[in-house]
A protein has these predicted regions:
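Helix-loop boundary and gating motifs at the non-cytosolic
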Residues: 1-48, 233-268, 274-278, 347
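C-terminal ends and interior cores of transmembrane alpha-helices
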Residues: 73-91, 311-325
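Juxtamembrane intracellular "pre-TM" segments in multi-pass secondary transporters
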Residues: 201-237, 263
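A membrane-interface helix-boundary motif in multi-pass transporters
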Residues: 155-189, 388-426
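Multi-pass alpha-helical transporter architecture, strongest
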Residues: 53, 81-87, 190-202, 394, ...
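Central cavity-lining transmembrane alpha-helices of secondary-active solute carriers
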Residues: 38-59, 277-293
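C-terminal transmembrane helical hairpin of 12-TM major facilitator-type secondary transporters
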Residues: 303-350
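Hydrophobic core of transmembrane alpha-helices in multi-pass small-molecule transporters
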Residues: 10, 75-79, 90-114, 118, ...
């Protein structure tokens, strides 16, 4: 069963890895560069409602793996529609494309919590401890994300020809999936495979008949009872503040690295032309660091695990602001490597923490509530503000890149200032969390 759950996470995150980091570049090329923040904020917008809602259904009405499969199948259909639209419209209409993407997210984002709920249930049904087994399974999600990133970074399709390249001097390099709507098609295909696969997983227990649900049940409002626990309340408030950091680099790091292609001193840099590949170092770091979460929670406690995560976010933004593909390449690499600590020490530790804090009838609610606070409220508000900050320093323009190649639409301007602003923000939140969080002694298992 460990192998089957590992495959689930591999596919689950490969769907996301196909487009998440390079989606901003696609939007910019399609004339929606000034609206990047709204597309990444949409991740948070749907997380305000759908994870807790589907978590409620998983707790009360249907097996979580059934909902997981159904959501993936619905999401893949909508993503296919987004690919069809983007392929036939070189200049994207904001309303049409945003609604398609919002529809995809409405079905895909609940699968994050549903996959965790399904996995935790299967582990417990076999006498296992989620604290010990979950990180070893979740690491395959990171591997799937990396594999998808590498594929879209190097694969191209042009004039009936399919192949792979990393060289900007290759005439087909500008048709790589990281620059084109093909990233959406690959995501859709993987979503179809994930949905079908999820439906083959075992059902831990059949759904029980429940009394008619109240409005608070339907919208997951009872999950907010967890706010009565002081330590959980503090964590969830800071989950909102930490959620601000989650989507910033996803939305802007690849366009930022790509912009160096238009600067003469970096135009021949392999890193500048392979931003998605460079960005994948973040996920490689995540894969190596994920197994540290359980050890860290036992040895230094939840409070310091989250504090370290926030300090890592600050270091990531700082290194992005000071780095470049030339003599500052080491700083870009460091910014990618610290992501493993920044993401895992918040995300994985947070999900384990909420699993412990929720009672047996509300495990799905607990997972959904964390998604709502971090990926929902935090990521939505944070990304909108971050987009305004970046747009005040940078703008999209058609610029020449490598000699003989067609001009590209790139995000040009003063990138150092916004990255330093984000670094200062994360540092401030880290200090506040260390000062404010106090927990009742808890054994994590």
């Amino acid at each position: 069963m460990k192998t089957r759950l590992s495959i689930l996470y591999f596919l689950q995150f490969a769907v996301w890895g196909c487009y998440l980091s390079c989606f901003g570049q696609l939007l910019g090329a399609g004339g929606l560069g000034a609206s990047i923040q709204w597309f990444y904020a949409a991740v948070g917008l749907v997380s305000l409602f759908t994870p807790a809602l589907f978590g409620h259904f998983a707790d009360r009405f249907a097996p979580s793996r059934t909902l997981l499969g159904a959501c993936h199948l619905a999401a893949c259909v909508v993503m296919f529609g987004a690919w069809t639209y983007a392929s036939s419209h070189p200049q994207l209409d904001f309303t049409a494309f945003f609604l398609l993407y919002l529809g995809f997210l409405a079905f895909y984002m609940p699968t994050m919590a549903l996959s965790n709920t399904t996995t935790f249930a299967i582990i417990r049904s076999r006498g296992g401890l989620p604290m010990e087994q979950f990180p070893k399974l979740r690491i395959w999600g990171t591997i799937g994300f990396i594999a998808a990133m590498w594929f879209v970074n190097s694969a191209y399709y042009h004039d009936g020809s399919f192949g792979f390249t990393l060289s900007d001097s290759d005439p087909a390099s500008h048709f790589r999936f990281q620059y084109t709507p093909m990233q959406l098609l690959v995501s859709s295909i993987l979503g179809l495979l994930t949905g079908l696969y999820a439906l083959t997983l075992p059902v831990v227990k059949a759904p029980e008949k429940k009394p008619a649900a109240s409005l608070s049940d339907i919208f997951g409002l009872k999950a907010f009872r967890l706010f009565k626990i002081p330590s959980v309340r503090t964590f969830l408030i800071f989950a909102v503040l930490t959620g601000v950091c989650l989507q910033i680099s996803n939305g802007f790091a690849v366009p930022y690295i790509n912009h160096f292609m238009a600067r003469a001193e970096y135009s021949s840099s392999l890193a500048a032309g392979n931003a998605t590949l460079l960005f994948s170092l973040s996920q490689i770091s995540e894969a190596f660091c994920i197994l540290l979460v359980g050890v860290a929670m036992k040895r230094i406690g939840f409070r310091w695990v989250i504090t370290i995560a926030l300090l890592a976010w600050s270091a990531r933004f700082l290194c992005l602001g000071l780095g470049n593909p030339g003599d500052g390449l080491i700083l870009l690499i460091i910014s990618m490597l610290v992501y493993g600590i920044a993401f895992n020490f918040f995300n994985i530790a947070g999900h384990i923490y909420m699993e412990q804090a929720s009672d047996t009838s509300n495990k799905g609610f607990g997972q959904g509530l964390l998604m709502l606070m971090s990926n929902g409220i935090g990521a939505t508000g944070g990304m909108i503000i971050a987009g305004s900050v970046v747009n005040s320093f940078c703008h999209w323009e058609m610029v020449p890149t490598t000699p003989g190649a067609a001009p590209m639409r790139l995000f040009m301007g003063d990138w150092t200032s916004p990255w330093l602003i984000f670094a200062a923000y994360a540092l401030t939140v880290a200090i506040l969390f260390a000062l404010c969080y106090r927990a009742t002694t808890r054994k994590y298992n």
